[in-house]
């Protein structure tokens, strides 16, 4: 009887797992089942104001499941940090009519559960002398977050830092040019990010032109099953990856390291100073250094005390060999549906192996790279019922352009609402 009961419990778990829908086509890793705002209201950003009706902040700060779409392009000059404190939100940057959205002056902070953020730019800069991350977040109890195709740069602290979150994916993000000798209270601080969490996947991201923290693995309780795979690191200064203390458990697999003009060494990892971190390191490529590529362990400090022979549990992704990951990342990473001139130049310099900005590619101010690009603005398609789906698209798929409620219906697919089908389809046509 006990065995029969156990069988049906197991069957229920399997059925539930099979029934779960991934966040969107291409979502991978531990955060792939994040639902975001699925089934909730559609909120349309209609202006570039910092606050008020139609602003991005107004949409973010509302409660309940919600999907945020954009009827405008351009740069939003924030007047204070923009905090996602309320659960269940999808931010669909790919919905903007042309070049998309950039957040300026203050950070975007993800402190909620069940969050999907896609295809936006976060470029803080030094205008307000703000000692902060660009895109940050992570708190104990936070679950289910996926950050996808985000471009973040010009932070005075780290460009992208998120940890403490359970079931997290950061994928296809372009993290570039933190500000090194700027106004940070600790002095020079051109750092990429602090990455970690419990069941956290970081894959196919680009870390470019940071002096250190490429990345730093978080050294807080609960840093377990962190999978760092198929990422590209270019032109680090004095450190690539380090950290992972407080008994961290980290996989570093199949990443591609390309030294640039500022790179001072070919090390892959400096282990945590407290000696408690454990790391599985395998299959990483150091361009131009066959010794490190053949034997990753020779590029790890204190290798005999911290390396393990088998990987920690991880959620499989569509994994590439490192050289293929490098090519794909340069082609697809960041806010790639419509790249701005700055991202294009970063990727060109990575490909060429150069660093013409600042000192050997390490910068102290966004002024050294030309500042915020002007984003092209487009005209949104007519949307009579303001449900986020243009009339022409609703007509094509047999929906009612005078009924806003059909955005959250499952007319076209049993797993995704109609607005999700529209948003996911936009990327196929770019």
Task: Please report, for each region that a protein language model flagged, where it lies by residue.
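Structural detector of coil-to-beta-strand junctions
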Residues: 107, 134-136, 159, 181-182, ...
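Extracellular beta-rich repeat passengers
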Residues: 219-366
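Right-handed parallel beta-helix
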Residues: 88, 93, 113-124, 141-154, ...
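Extracellular beta-strand-rich, repetitive "passenger/adhesive" scaffolds
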Residues: 94-102, 120, 402-406
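Extracellular beta-strand-rich solenoid/capping regions of secreted or surface-exposed proteins
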Residues: 57-64, 76-90, 101-118, 124-142, ...
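Acidic Gly/Asp/Thr-rich repetitive segments characteristic of extracellular carbohydrate-active
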Residues: 23-68
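Proline-centered structural pivot motif
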Residues: 376-381, 392-430
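Bacterial Sec-dependent N-terminal signal peptides
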Residues: 1-20
